[in-house]
Amino acid sequence: MTRAAGGMSDADVIIVGAGLAGLTCALTLTAAGREVVVLEASDGVGGRIRTDVVDGYRLDRGFQVLLTGYPAARRWFDLDALELQSFSPGVVIRHRGRFRRLADPLRAPVAGAASILSPVTTLADGLRLLAWRHSVLHTPGQEVAARSQVTTAELVEGRGFSPAITAGFFSPFLAGTFFDPGMTTSSRVTELVFRSFFQGEVAVPALGMEQLPRQLAARLPLDTVRLGHRVAAVGHGEVHLSDGGTLRAPQVVVATEGPAAAELLGDRLPGGVAPDRGTVTLYYLADTSPVPRADLVLDADREGPVNNLAVMNEVAPTYAPPEGRALVSVSTVGVPAEDDVALDTAVRRHLTGWYGAEVASWDRLAAYRIPHAQPRQDVEDLPTLAREVRVDGTTWVCGDHRDTSSIQGALVSGRRTAEAILAA
């Protein structure tokens, strides 16, 4: 599999894309002694996981979190070095015009017990949730992934949860997790993600989510990653750059997001790609924090475009400069057709119903439109969770569209593809 000395190749393997999948693929290959070149079109590593610093505020490009319960996260990241900052256990639900806290009774017993008295849930729901938690935590992940596949709505109904907790918690929570308020996501994916929620914490690195790919890239040999190299086409054993250059290698891996992989590979892409689900994340600066805790707030009333909200420097003080204002992150489900000004107006109208007239004084800092936030993960999209990564004898593909649409899926996909190359 290694290239012959003096050959015409530029590397043993060329990887297109420096997101999590491409970086873990590169790390696995270089650890096995392969010479790798990673081509990245943008000015930094990370793909969709990037962080901008604006006036001292750290803005992740979209609302993103790390579940420390992800097995691959524990394998690939130095979690201590990331100085993770965690959200409060549980969530706050905007339900029938009031805020109601739903807490994990095993991590926050007092708040968890109070949750049972909330109109969002019942004692029976609490007991069913504990039983489900026990089921997924005491079943190996491979067995959870192999369970019969139904929609998440059918899974929740089959477990006997009440309509109140379905509408008041599961729907807005899954809208925030999968951009899927209709709960059509595969039950296999939902159970695996809930397993990770139950096993760990929901957190962000102190310096922003981009620290995840940066940490991986720092372990690669010097000059492995080449930024600003946009790939226009992928052939058999060669990569054509948009500037007219060509690089060659015995093996080429396309490690981009799904739509870009489909564009580069066309009908060669095994199984194609599922439609994407999108979101818009807006950042505001407020003089007073509307949520004076590290809470994730979800909307169950659906009276406007906001699905979830968090004050990021309540979670991670390092997301704002010292003595800075409250950094409010607001996200939608889907990418609305209206422009940022119209969307901002709708968001403010929605949140004024939550926090009052002070919302009018918030300053909008940024808006990120992310049409390809996640591949859809409905039952028909996932005949198997591990989709084919081999395109042909010289070309491979990896990314969250090959496994689950998550950080876990991207990391697993990159490693799985590298191991397939090494075994070929």
Give, region by region, the residue ranges found by the protein language model.
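N-terminal Rossmann-like FAD-binding beta1-loop-alpha1 element of flavoenzymes
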Residues: 11-38, 422
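Mid-domain catalytic core of redox enzymes
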Residues: 7, 232-341, 349, 353-354
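Hydrophobic/small residue at the entry helix of a nucleotide-binding pocket
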Residues: 20-21, 45, 413
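Conserved flavin/dinucleotide-binding core of flavoenzymes
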Residues: 3-6, 318-424
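Glycine-rich FAD pyrophosphate-binding loop
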Residues: 30-54
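N-terminal glycine-rich dinucleotide-binding loop that anchors FAD/FMN and/or NAD(P) in oxidoreductases
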Residues: 52-76
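Helical element adjacent to the flavin cofactor pocket in flavoenzyme catalytic cores
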Residues: 191-241, 247-251
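Mobile amphipathic helical/loop "lid" adjacent to a hydrophobic cofactor/ligand pocket
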Residues: 70-74, 78, 83-183, 195-199
